[in-house]
Amino acid sequence: CGVGNFFGMLPESMSESKLYGVELDSITGRIARQLYPNARIEVNGFEKTQYPDGVFDLAIGNVPFGNYRVSDRPYDRHNLLIHDYFFAKTIDKVRVGGIIAFITSNGISGGTMDKKDTHAREYMARRCDLLGAVRLPNTTFRANAGTDIAMDIVFLQKREVPRMQGEPLPEWVETDLLRTNTYTDKDGRERHDHVT
């Protein structure tokens, strides 16, 4: 959850919501606890959390990314990279009809939505419907985080009934069918100086 930026941007209509957060870094997590004392923030790895399945209405986050895996027994058999693991576990934690809105990497960093290996997208497509995705220019987080990395915002809704093995999957599972917006190229570089 970082220092709780998503909590701070919560619309007034959701001000009575119960807030939960998970932050690996102890200093950052303690700052979030101070800023949002009514939120239940765990300072721990997501793989060590014990939230029950099907309890959250909405999950929002900026998932970690990288070419590594964490060990979490129920998910180890899927052999998912860290960012894809966050999707998989979160899908289980939201209720049927619940929404997931995650910022995740794309492009040469082995992103969730465009890497050649479709395993993670197949996992998501069996359990969720894709509501939409936005590809951000690689300069989106330059001023705030000092990084130039291409990112996607992915919106999923958990299905009432998962798609069965052998049932056709939606076209977004295949990378060659992924459509990007006109403001970024396939590597996430900006095509225009501004958007109006």
Predicted regions and their residues:
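Conserved nucleotide-binding/hydrolysis micro-motifs of P-loop NTPases
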Residues: P64-G66, N106-S109, T140, E160-P162
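Short glycine-enriched, charge-decorated loop/helix-capping segments at active-site entrances
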Residues: R73-H78
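Conserved Class I SAM-dependent methyltransferase catalytic core
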Residues: V22-S26, N79-R142, I149-F155
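Conserved ATPase-coupling elements of RecA-like P-loop NTPase cores
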Residues: Y68-D72, T112-M113
